[in-house]
């Protein structure tokens, strides 16, 4: 399966690595946000996903806006685009480039906790569970048909730093289990 992967933050790294480990899946391009100043000296630093893609020897693009590489994406003829913590809202012409659409891995049980900070929202609201949803992206933020979702209990002592890697690992398991089923029509 030919896949374009778009992601930026740490949450996306385990999912990228899991997809890259599948011998019958081919990541044709990893798209991430451009390097940004970080640290005391404000040194330009690649995103966590761009760094992981380089370690995996995957072709990477870091456009200021994803629509700037729309024709390059179309030329790759991806079967599916997977988006995880990318940080940009995708225009419809990018969403519809791949044969089976664009699948988002979102760290909440949609439609609850839409938006850019669902893990923090689950913790500040005192929820006892959250989860991960795989959904087809449409023109609205974190909106579209849910392919699958799975709950995860939030422990009494869980913080963002504890919960994020648990949810990322769950998302990685789900993408392997559910993406192929979705593409094959199961």
Go through each PLM region and give its residues.
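Catalytic cores of RNA-modifying enzymes
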Residues: 1, 53-56, 73-80
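N-terminal Rossmann-like dinucleotide-binding module
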Residues: 1-40
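Short, well-ordered alpha-helical microsegments
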Residues: 12-14, 69-70, 90-92
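Short, structured coil segments at secondary-structure junctions
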Residues: 23, 56, 97-98
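N-terminal beta-loop-helix "entrance" segment that forms/cooperates
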Residues: 34-54
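Short acidic-hydrophobic, aromatic-tinged amphipathic segments that line or gate anion-handling sites
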Residues: 60-65
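Short amphipathic alpha-helix with an adjacent loop that forms part of the alpha/beta core around
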Residues: 67-77, 96
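Donor/substrate-binding cores of folate-linked one-carbon enzymes
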Residues: 80-186
């Amino acid at each position: 399966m030919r896949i374009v992967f778009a992601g930026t933050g740490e949450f996306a790294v385990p999912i990228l690595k899991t997809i890259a480990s599948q011998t019958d899946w081919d990541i044709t391009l990893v798209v991430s946000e451009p390097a940004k100043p970080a640290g005391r000296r404000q040194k330009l630093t690649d995103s966590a996903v761009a760094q992981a893609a380089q370690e995996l020897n995957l072709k990477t693009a870091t456009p200021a806006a994803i629509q700037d590489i729309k024709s390059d994406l179309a030329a790759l003829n991806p079967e599916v685009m997977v988006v995880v913590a990318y940080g940009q809202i995708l225009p419809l012409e990018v969403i519809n480039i791949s044969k089976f659409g664009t699948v988002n891995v979102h760290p909440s049980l949609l439609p609850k906790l839409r938006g850019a900070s669902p893990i923090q929202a689950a913790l500040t609201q005192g929820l006892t569970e959250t989860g991960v949803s795989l959904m087809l992206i449409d023109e609205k933020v974190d909106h579209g048909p849910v392919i699958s979702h799975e709950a995860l209990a939030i422990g009494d002592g869980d913080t963002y730093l504890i919960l994020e890697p648990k949810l990322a690992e769950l998302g990685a398991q789900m993408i392997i289990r559910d993406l192929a089923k979705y593409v094959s029509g199961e």
